[in-house]
Amino acid sequence: MHMSKSFLLISMGLASISVHAQTLTRDNGAPVGDNQNSITAGENGSVLLQDVHLIQKLQRFARERIPERVVHARGTGAHGEFVASGDFSDLTLSSPFAQSGKVTPVFVRFSTVIHSKGSPETLRDPRGFATKFYTDQGNWDLVGNNLPVFFIRDSIKFPDMVHSLKPSPVTNLQDPNRFFDFFSSQPSATNMLTWVYTNLGTPASYRTMDGFGVHAYKWINQKGEVNYVKFHWKSQQGVKSLRPAEVTKVQGEDFNHLTNDLYTQINAGNFPKWDLYVKVLSPKALSKLDYNGLDATKVWLDVPEKKVGTMTLNRVPDNFFLETEQSAFAPSNIIPGIEPSEDRLLQGRLFAYADTQLYRLGANLFQLPVNSPKSPVANHNQDGPSNNSTGLGNVDSLDVNYEPSRLVNLTVDKQARAVETPLSGHVQQQAIRNPRDFFQAGVLYRSLSEQDKADLIHNLSGDLNKVNDAEVKAIMVSYFYRADKEYGTRLAKATDVNLKQVTKLASM
């Protein structure tokens, strides 16, 4: 019989595939005999409960999902490295900034904030910019956004704010009537609303947006000296956003544009870079600001920035769920030389972010590879679901799960002790002094180009015009009028709100 050369090659190829094929197994490692047909009682009989492969397959399928993040649900991540641009040990004893050229591995997760996991990435929203530094002192998480401020200054309002921005419990639709009703009683949101309704609220790509730590943090040096700092990631790709017409066009073509762009560019070797800058203020200088420097609704105006390093993202995750979805960020993940400030919003986030990760991933989340520190972990935390650690990991210490012990000498690092902070006053429950809710929104508005101002009015009035309550609409316009008269006047015209009513409300 004559066989063609091509037929022989195909046959040899199939044989090769057969020889090297991996056997399909169940989770217990046992081989699967048939993955196409269930076990039945006869040709047309019922499926048998003894079909353990079928049962396990369905059980595992039903348990594939973990709880969605309550905020920042839609996200994408990438690996990379941070390289210090100098020696900043005079300011902080944290290792990423200890010497020029110091390399620290990082994992970054970008995200939308309010919208759900499968939502379009074109929707207007702040964008999360969370960076996990795998330092030799432990993991440090810088958990920020692409905008420098936030809607509220006290974490006690965070659940209310998120509830107002999330879909209605009745219709399951996001509704401007709900969130502007909330914001009409929160003048502190004026600055952030101005930021998010500029075109920065619809970035063209994750590569072309800046990032901010939002809050003030403390840097502590070897001498125990304290300075307050704010962090700013500056994109080397420049900042590019989508204008209103572009948003509509992009959403119609690809509502995953942010993820697609990041993956495509990194896989093509076009690695995005960000320079990290810090603003530094001594406690005395912070106290002299004419607004509260610990207020998360404020930018530190006219404070110079200092470059401290550059981050490069150079690898996308091998598996989205294992790395991006299971990555867990929390501002409470800090290292020696960095401490939280007294910012009231940050103080609440220290608890809330860590707690929500425990809810999503369980008590042993730090054993997941993406969350596991590169530095050694030694403590007496034990057990819990999916635990695969023996704590200290030392055979000689397996029986000792407490401290102190004469059997196992587990020491502490005094450099990691909390810095001494002088306190005065009384326990109280009061709003901050000197809130100055409107002036920075005016500064931002006046800094915009005429085109950006027009887009801001278009974007903001588009949602305000969906508000049915005339009083809520007028109050909101009055806030923007108090920020800048031109801003408020143009917005009143675009929303058909009586300007006399606006000026009256603004003067109250």
Curated annotation (Swiss-Prot):
It is found in: Periplasm. One of its GO terms (molecular function) is metal ion binding. Its cofactor is heme. Residues 373-396 are annotated as: Disordered. It comes from the Bacteria. Heme binds at Y353. The keyword Protease does not apply. It holds the Pfam family Catalase. Its EC number is 1.11.1.6. InterPro entries: Catalase, Catalase_AS, Catalase_clade1/3, Catalase_core, Catalase_haem_BS, Catalase_immune_responsive, Catalase_sf. It catalyses: 2 H2O2 = O2 + 2 H2O. The active site is at H72, N145. One of its GO terms (cellular component) is cytoplasm. Residues 1-21 form the signal peptide. The keyword Magnesium does not apply. One of its GO terms (biological process) is response to hydrogen peroxide. Its main location: periplasm. Decomposes hydrogen peroxide into water and oxygen; serves to protect cells from the toxic effects of hydrogen peroxide. Belongs to the catalase family. This is Catalase.
